[in-house]
Structures are given as structure tokens and as C-alpha cells.
Amino acid sequence: MTTRRGLTYKPSDIRKNGVRVLRSSNITEDSFTLGDEDVFVVREAVNIDCARANDILITAANGSSRLVGKHTIITGIPEESAVHGGFMLLGTTKEPHFVNASMGSSWYRRFIELFVAGGNGAIGNLSKNDLDNQEIAIPSEEEQKIIGSFFRQLDHLITLHQRKRSRLSVIFEIEHLQFI
């Protein structure tokens, strides 16, 4: 995976519309989300490559050390519409679903525990170089595709079950209210 540091900008660069700056708040659980609180900057302030669908967005620094290292695959953004912010890293790889799934495993949790500086009120910080220098066992490209596809399907099934549960809870709440 190739990682890149995020955009730093001045308050005067912020606009109501423009290029969206992806931040830690765009990672909800393990999903990519766009929100009303997203920040936009004037295009002239952008001096890095834009984020693309299937890039991996990683929180590199945060006031809460437990949020450092959270990650997700970027989906559903138009070309040239967003960049990652200064406290974020962006990973690009041929097999994003495999790499993102591997970042949910024990090696990554241990890596975060060992390498994230912070605590006692300090801002948690994940070094790009520390992440780049991690050595992990990587299966062949074909195996990565199969494993990545499996986890993508699993994520999809989990999402479907969460939606079903949410809808059922609404139905049961309505039934309960009608019974009363």
C-alpha cells in the first residue's frame, strides 16, 4: 500500500462549497460517510492528489488516541471532489478490500498499541513512516482478491442484517404502541 499525508489548509481557505476535506468524522464504525459537518476548501488550496473511490482513509492523529488508526474504504465520491485532511493518511493499493480487512486484524491492533504516541492528554499520532515500514505476510494477488471479495460480501451481509434489524425494531415499536 502506498500512503500519502493529507492536506493542510488555512481557515481562510474554507468555503461552503468546493473540494471536500475528508476527516476522521467521515469514518463511522468501519463505513465511509459524508456528513453535513464536512469542511470544504477552495480548489486553489489543494496541493495534493484527490482521493478516489477504493482508497483507504486512515485517521493518523486525533485528540482521542483510541480513534487513531481507524480506517475505511472510500466509496461513492465523484472524481476530483475530495482530499484527505492533514490529520489523515490515504492508502492506495490494488486490493483495497484485502488490505482494509487486514487492518482489522490482530497485527494492526498490536501495531496501533505499540506505535501510536499519545495519552495523558497528548494527541494520539500515527506516523506514516511507521505504517509504511510494517512487514506483514501477504498472500498472492489471486488470494488477496478472493479474501477481499469474501470480506466485501461479509460487510454487505452485515449491512443488510443491520437494516433488517432496524426496520424490525420500528415495526415492533409500532405494534407495541398499537397494543397499548
What are these regions (language model features)?
Residues 1-180:
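Feature detects amphipathic, helix-rich regulatory segments
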